[in-house]
Design a protein with these regions (language model features):
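Hydrophobic pocket/interface hotspot
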Residues: 17-22, 28, 70-72, 90, ...
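Beta-strand/loop substructures that line and gate deep hydrophobic ligand-binding cavities in soluble
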Residues: 100-157
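Hydrophobic ligand-binding cavity/cleft-lining segments
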Residues: 1-56, 66
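Charged phosphate-binding loop/patch that engages nucleotide di/tri-phosphates or the phosphate backbone
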Residues: 164-172
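K/E-rich alpha-helical interaction surfaces of small helical-bundle regulatory domains
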Residues: 112, 160-161, 165
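Glycine-rich portal/gate segments that line the openings of hydrophobic small-molecule binding cavities
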Residues: 40-104
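Short, surface-exposed coil-to-beta transition loops
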Residues: 4-6, 82-87, 109-114
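Beta-strand elements of well-folded, non-transmembrane domains
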Residues: 11-13, 74-80, 92-94, 107, ...
């Protein structure tokens, strides 16, 4: 059985800036709640498709296109020191619209995360609607509903944290 969650937030920044931020794996630990102590262990980047967007040489070297793999570690049950490993792969990428990642190895039987961005005006200000769509499964049979009740709250907490700190991170 697969579970689905969707999170939306709006930030008062242009879509190009927001997309570049999310497409750089180095920003992932900054988006996570500090208690998770998320770290990037290794990254194998595949450059995104060529675009007419002007990128600095640093941006060209740091963005994750299709085929990129990011290995992270995190505290499984904060504040306990036990660390888990997560291997993610970028499977889809369209400039300033979306990218998708799947879990190759980690705590779930399956995990699919689509990061969508939509240019949107609110109160006469141009900004970006950030939409995160997550589908995941545990594969634990009869234990799935119990685990789902616990884990969905934790996932919601992570995305609430991301939504709260994203504007400040984009300022920096």
């Amino acid at each position: 059985m697969s579970s689905h969650l969707e999170f939306k937030s709006w930030v008062g920044f242009p879509i190009e800036k927001v997309f570049l931020f999310f497409a750089d794996p180095a920003n992932l630990p900054r988006l996570m709640p500090p208690i998770t102590d998320t770290r990037i262990d290794t990254v194998r980047l595949v450059p995104p498709p060529v675009t007419s967007i002007q990128l600095t040489s640093e941006q060209q070297r740091s963005l994750a296109g299709i085929g990129s793999e990011i290995v992270t570690s995190f505290r499984v049950l904060p504040p306990l020191p036990l660390r888990g490993r997560w291997v993610a792969k970028i499977t889809a990428f369209r400039w300033n619209e979306f990218f998708e990642d799947v879990q190759l190895q980690g705590p779930f039987k399956s995990w699919h995360h689509r990061h969508e961005l939509v240019s949107e005006v609110r109160e006469d200000k141009q900004g970006t609607l950030v939409i995160d769509k997550v589908a995941y499964a545990f594969g634990l049979g009869p234990l799935d509903p119990l685990i789902e009740a616990l884990v969905s709250k934790r996932i919601e907490g992570i995305f609430t944290h991301r939504q709260r700190i994203l504007p400040d991170l984009l300022l920096g």
